Amino acid sequence: MAGLSLQHPWAFAFGLLGNLISFTTYLAPIPTFYRIYKSKSTEGFQSVPYVVALFSAMLWIFYALIKSNEALLITINAAGCVIETIYIVMYLAYAPKKAKVFTTKILLLLNVGVFGVILLLTLLLSHGEQRVVSLGWVCVAFSVSVFVAPLSIIKRVIQSRSVEYMPFSLSLTLTLSAVVWFLYGLLIKDKYVALPNILGFTFGVVQMGLYVFYMNATPVAGEGKEGKGKLAAAEELPVVVNVGKLAAATPDRSTGAVHVHPVPRSCAAEAAAAEPEVLVDIPPPPPPRAVEVAAV
């Protein structure tokens, strides 16, 4: 790192800044996992983003070790490995059995199987600079696939006309991170670091543009918070139950209150005919908890 800071002071500065921004991005899911810890349930959250983030960090550490003199890449991705591992362990601790099995399979397939194959092929089939080239393009391909993932969120925002699925702060952070790491890769002449971040910057700008365009738009009925609000309002309509046929009502002359007393079935019809209907406003059960899907 000392050599990098002396020979490429600007590269060192951007790399250090990239470490700080990326670290804050790694910490973004903390509120989600605090909620999981408090409720002792994963509440429908998915584990795939954290498994993929762990795989990405492992891949970039391997690349940095093969290339050498890439301490800044190692530090941030090592931190990422630790943080994502903690997230995954917490997820497995509180997830239902089906989600645990699925997460374990994905971990074994991607982080053990695929990573193991990449490691062996890189070490056995290539040598010297060719290792850096081969592994570099693997990192580029995987990073591009990760950056393309937000397309589903972009589609959802356009269809629902609601930005609740795409926080502006996260889009801004990811865009800044892409800019900083692109400049870092450009300054150290590493196209494998720079190229994926061009796409990352592009998607980040598109997301922020969509946020500005739709932040005051009226969500499509049944979508977004407004649609959910209408559904919740419908669920909160009072349930009116006619108890006239089930009980007899007698007024309390001292207070004027009406007391409802159960009567035998044999007298139910007579009570219904003799007494007026008594309407009881019973509040409905609370609406189901909204399921929040977490994204990195």
Curated annotation (Swiss-Prot):
Residues 13-98, 134-217 form the MtN3/slv domain. The chain crosses the membrane at residues 10-30, 46-66, 72-92, 106-126, 134-154, 168-188, 193-213. Disulfide bonds: none annotated. Induction: By the X.oryzae pv. oryzae (Xoo) transcription activator-like effector (TALe) proteins (artificial TAL effectors). It is a multi-pass membrane protein. Residues 31-45, 93-105, 155-167, 214-296 are cytoplasmic. GO terms for cellular component: membrane; plasma membrane. Pfam families: MtN3_slv (PF03083). Residues 1-9, 67-71, 127-133, 189-192 are extracellular. Mediates both low-affinity uptake and efflux of sugar across the plasma membrane. Confers blight susceptibility. Confers TAL effector-mediated susceptibility to Xanthomonas oryzae pv. oryzae. This is Bidirectional sugar transporter SWEET13. It comes from Oryza sativa subsp. japonica (Rice). The lineage of its organism: Eukaryota, Viridiplantae, Streptophyta, Embryophyta, Tracheophyta. The gene is SWEET13.
